[in-house]
Amino acid sequence: MSTILDRIKAYKLEEIAARKAERPLVAVEDAARAAPAPRGFARALSTAAATGYGLIAEIKKASPSKGLIREDFDVPALARAYETGGATCLSVLTDGPSFQGADDFLRQAREAVKLPCLRKDFLYDTYQVAEARALGADCILIIMASVTDSQALELEAAASHWGMDVLVEVHSREELARAEHLKSRLIGINNRNLDTFEVSLDVTRDLARRVPEDRLIVSESGLHTPEDLADLARYGARCFLIGESLMRQADVEAATRAILADPLTAQGGV
């Protein structure tokens, strides 16, 4: 029985083949070389985490498990709201079929703010890495559940070639062990199971203590309140990727500011 991740991989491989046929790699690489210089995604998170929390705020219109998340979807306005609200970096969904994302959303977001941006997509081919840089991405995502070790190494090397950082995402002890063979300092612990889409913060509680001290932990998914962040910080997570719980708020700027507040003084959550 195929999982959601299996289905995503199937259409992504078709999409990659179609894009290669439509736009040769040399053209993508020319665009990547012409793109504005990377802004230092990992550096920004590390600096923020040294004195507080590093927040990767996500621009996400929909998801396979929840359907449409936000109807009022003005990407530049959302990016500015996140920046003003205190986000450290942005994550922008560019996958269309499952998340109603688009390449142009990344361009729009990065042009609207000064924050480093992650291209949030399912990457399997170094062509997509060059594509990410051409779009202005400062960081890419490698999901260990969806790639082989050799693919992960190739994607990471390509990102390094283009001056981008890599967020390596894991959900299990086995995936974490594999991720440790990569050079990237950023380890994303996804609290969402990509096979079932069930969410549990226990994933971060279990894995965070196993992450080498020289890595920077980013807890992802299922984060709704300042208390959630404070709880996971006790396990070593100082950076967080938050999307849906912020995207559902009418006032995204206020919601961003609220979730970063000290839980002892915060008035409720988002």
From Swiss-Prot:
Catalytic activity field: 1-(2-carboxyphenylamino)-1-deoxy-D-ribulose 5-phosphate + H(+) = (1S,2R)-1-C-(indol-3-yl)glycerol 3-phosphate + CO2 + H2O
What Enzyme Commission number(s) appear in the record?
Answer: 4.1.1.48
**Source organism superkingdom:** Bacteria
User: Which EC class is this protein assigned?
Assistant: lyase
Q: Which GO terms describe its biological process?
A: L-tryptophan biosynthetic process
Q: Which PANTHER family match?
A: INDOLE-3-GLYCEROL-PHOSPHATE SYNTHASE (PTHR22854:SF2), TRYPTOPHAN BIOSYNTHESIS PROTEIN (PTHR22854)
Similarity remark: Belongs to the TrpC family.
From the Swiss-Prot or TrEMBL record, give the protein name: Indole-3-glycerol phosphate synthase
Organism in which the protein naturally occurs: Cereibacter sphaeroides (strain ATCC 17023 / DSM 158 / JCM 6121 / CCUG 31486 / LMG 2827 / NBRC 12203 / NCIMB 8253 / ATH 2.4.1.)
Coding gene? trpC
